């Protein structure tokens, strides 16, 4: 196995004497922990995800950031006219990024989630983030929002609440999803006190606080074993994204092979 590959997968620093000690490749991801409890009527799943990217988590410098979730699953078989199958609550916080005045010092700068010093489009693929869609790329946000030219993700400091549910009402299946967020831009577009070392913070404008609501609703019905119909509606309202809505009518057919 090539030595460089071992350095990549372990995150160990590499130096051959001619170049400075660096980690090879990029190491972005999350550390997950979860607990599942199964009762007679409901199954409960609690989980927490922490970001890691530039090494701040090893110093507990961005331990405040992460995703907290609670999922409830109905374990009862029922013929009730109203039946919930799953319910989900999530809270996402990404404001810290090891850049708060009280954040423990680290060998690297703040995390600046999904942005990159060399890749103009950061950690994205075909214009979309490789992680949570709540961290906003430049092309999705309103054009009048302040942004630093080095940031492809112009909003990565946020507090968001998400709710989801699916079940049935009078024989019709339903899916509901809604996210509400307060968005604070990046450390380059804030006037908040910080320990990031950024020298031009606020030079390209102040992002302030932008609030956003995004919602999705689906009502579906199986007409028989093969044919299904669904009505779908989606809505964006707020000051981060442009206001928009859409209505869809979906028909599906399942083949038995």
Language model regions located:
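Acidic/polar loop-and-plug regions of large Gram-negative outer-membrane beta-barrel proteins
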Residues: 1-20
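Outer-membrane beta-barrel pore domains
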Residues: 19-257
């Amino acid at each position: 196995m090539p030595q460089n590959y071992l350095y990549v997968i372990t995150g160990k620093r590499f130096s051959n004497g001619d170049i400075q000690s660096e980690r090879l490749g990029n190491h972005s991801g999350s550390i997950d922990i979860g607990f599942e409890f199964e009762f007679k009527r409901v199954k409960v799943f609690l989980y927490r995800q922490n970001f890691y990217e530039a090494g701040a988590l090893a110093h507990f410098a961005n331990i405040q950031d992460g995703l907290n979730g609670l999922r409830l699953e109905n374990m009862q078989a029922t013929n009730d006219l109203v039946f919930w199958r799953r319910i989900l609550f999530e809270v996402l916080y990404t404001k810290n990024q090891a850049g708060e005045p009280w954040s423990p010092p680290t060998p690297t700068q703040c995390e600046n989630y999904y942005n990159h010093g060399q890749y103009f489009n950061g950690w994205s693929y075909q214009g979309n983030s490789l992680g949570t869609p709540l961290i906003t790329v430049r092309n999705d946000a309103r054009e009048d929002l302040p942004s630093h030219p080095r940031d492809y993700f112009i909003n990565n400091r946020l507090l968001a609440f998400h709710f989801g549910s699916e079940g049935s009402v009078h024989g019709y299946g339903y899916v509901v999803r809604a996210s509400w967020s307060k968005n604070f831009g990046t450390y380059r577009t804030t006037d908040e006190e910080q320990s990031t070392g950024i020298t031009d913070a606020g030079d390209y404008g102040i992002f302030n606080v932008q609030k956003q609501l995004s919602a999705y609703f689906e009502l579906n019905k199986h007409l028989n074993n093969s044919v299904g119909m669904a009505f779908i509606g989606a809505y964006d309202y707020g000051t981060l994204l442009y206001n928009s809505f859409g209505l869809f009518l979906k028909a599906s057919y399942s083949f038995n092979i």
